[in-house]
Amino acid sequence: SFVPPIKGYDLRGVFTLRTIEDAHEISTYANNTDNVVLIGGGLLGIETGYALRKSGKKVTVVESFPRLLPRQLDVDGAFRLQQILEEMGFHFRLSAKTLEIIGDNQTTTGVILEGGEVL
């Protein structure tokens, strides 16, 4: 999968999801955190977020497009999906750009969005 050139992408606690091994690493790491930020509102991210929500994690999805699944859903379908996911406890930052992943001692502590919001 595409990894955008974001400062801090190499910190501990930042993952890509390409293989089943990646999924296992994410699951193992998630046991030690309560908050998860998913960069990208695509199908794999949403599915991963769903699994993490079921395990009690706070999940925030950062998507650069103004809606989820822009290649798969029209505006109405994306809005309905977002409503359903929000009812499940998801949080969204749409039309948002990730500027930097921040951390201390090489471990992720947050994500800075364009505009200055820190997740």
Tell where the protein language model's regions lie, with residue ranges.
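Short beta->alpha linker loops
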Residues: R18-E21, L43, A96
